[in-house]
Amino acid sequence: MKIITTVQEMQQITNELRASGKSIGFVPTMGYLHEGHATLLRKAREENEIVVLSVFVNPLQFGPNEDLDRYPRDIDRDENVAKENGVDYLFYPSVEEMYPAEQTTTVEVVKRTDVLCGKQRPGHFAGVATVLMKLFNITLPTRAYFGMKDAQQVAVIEGFVADFNIPVTIVPVDIVREEDGLAKSSRNVYLSQEEREEAPHLYRSLCIAKERIEAGERNAEIITTLVKEYIETYTKGTVDYADLYTYPSLQVVDKIEGRIILAIAVKFDNVRLIDNITLTVK
């Protein structure tokens, strides 16, 4: 595995690889890698001749009161995970390398961002789309891999790739969970012991809701109320949202039918956790 820190060297390598006909699987991350990231890397390894991993904590996607400064970082750990999962190139640029001057152009996402995390975090997805436009141009991937834990992000990325005719296939990968159901996340390290014990109730609330839908419930408000009340009963977290939308278009659902997403965000003392399930309802 080779570690690359400059845009110029990374672009030169990927240009040569694509010119020689090699397929490139790309996994963009903010680091502090866990089993969820490892799953993305293994899938990229299975489906491509070359695997590129980026580790970059992107300041553009953090709001003024968010956790940019304390976002967990451990490049030694990330290098080990990368090596163990078949990464060929680890792209690890500095902020100054990615943004050497004030950004004069950003990608403004106008659809699929006014709900869920996009509603709570204005400007977040513009930051995500902008850095991905840069990373796609730097790494020239054949396929790019994203976890469905942030399903809204996947929907936004699929839309922006289609809109700009970017020649990359977006590959969504199922959520990876702890044994007790908690979705794996770099931010789980912020949980206190008590919060960690309560956190699996987020996924349990989604499973209970799924059972109700499969049993025939089609009223969206009944389902979202059930989820909120369950979380408020069994955790000390504050429900930021518990919402149902069509997926991937993220339109409001009254009657549950077709492909939908039930997504939640819950705030604990030092961390905000998200989770979701997608299902197709006939």
Curated annotation (Swiss-Prot):
Its EC number is 6.3.2.1. Pfam families: Pantoate_ligase. One of its GO terms (cellular component) is cytosol. The active site is at H37 (proton donor). Beta-alanine binds at Q61. GO terms for molecular function: ATP binding; pantoate-beta-alanine ligase activity. The keyword Ligase applies. (R)-pantoate binds at Q61, Q153. InterPro entries: Cyt_trans-like (IPR004821), Pantoate_ligase (IPR003721), Pantoate_ligase_C (IPR042176), Rossmann-like_a/b/a_fold (IPR014729). Disulfide bonds: none annotated. HAMAP family: PanC. Belongs to the pantothenate synthetase family. Homodimer. This is Pantothenate synthetase. It comes from Bacillus cereus (strain ATCC 10987 / NRS 248).
